[in-house]
Regions:
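Catalytic cores of alpha/beta
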Residues: 35-46, 53-63, 67, 76-100
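Short, structured secondary-structure boundary patches
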Residues: 51-52, 69-76, 118-122
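Alpha/beta enzyme core
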Residues: 3-7, 13-27, 32-47, 92-93
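Glycine- and other small-residue-rich loops at beta-strand/loop junctions that grip anionic moieties
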Residues: 8, 29-30, 50-51, 79-80, ...
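Flexible C-terminal active-site loop/helix
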Residues: 89-122
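Conserved strand-to-helix beginnings and helix N-cap segments that scaffold or border functional pockets
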Residues: 12-13, 110
Length: 122
């Protein structure tokens, strides 16, 4: 459940309830704070996406979920401008997965061309 849907549905708990009602597997939810992450786990989220672009936020969520004994029951994802050099630090901060959308969307285009040398349509 994306952060805009969380707002439209009235908060993290309501968004997770809506996601669980669909019944298509673990609910993933974007959070922006430790409090939202803890609430999300309590509401049954299976994947917590710390989408703040700040590894300190990810580390704080990871530490708090560990402290509360909740970390083993949930996967942590991290996003927000992730670059290749961020993968190691994200893993060290507790990420099980990373969102590399920007790296893909902002990748330089390849200049490709195709030349047909012969064609046989018989």
């Amino acid at each position: 459940v994306g952060k805009n849907a969380v707002i439209m549905l009235g908060g993290v708990d309501q968004a997770i309830a809506a996601g669980r009602a669909v019944g298509h597997g673990p609910v993933a939810v974007q959070v922006k704070s430790v409090a939202e992450a803890v609430s999300a786990v309590g509401s049954g989220a299976g994947i917590i996406m710390v989408d703040t672009a700040d590894l300190a936020d990810l580390a704080a969520v990871h530490a708090e979920l560990n402290r509360l004994g909740l970390r083993d029951g949930v996967r942590l994802a991290f996003g927000g401008g992730v670059r290749l050099q961020d993968l190691g630090p994200a893993g060290a901060a507790g990420a099980d997965a990373v969102d590399v959308g920007r790296a893909i969307l902002d990748a330089p285009l390849l200049d490709l061309r195709m030349r047909v040398c012969a064609a046989d349509f018989d």
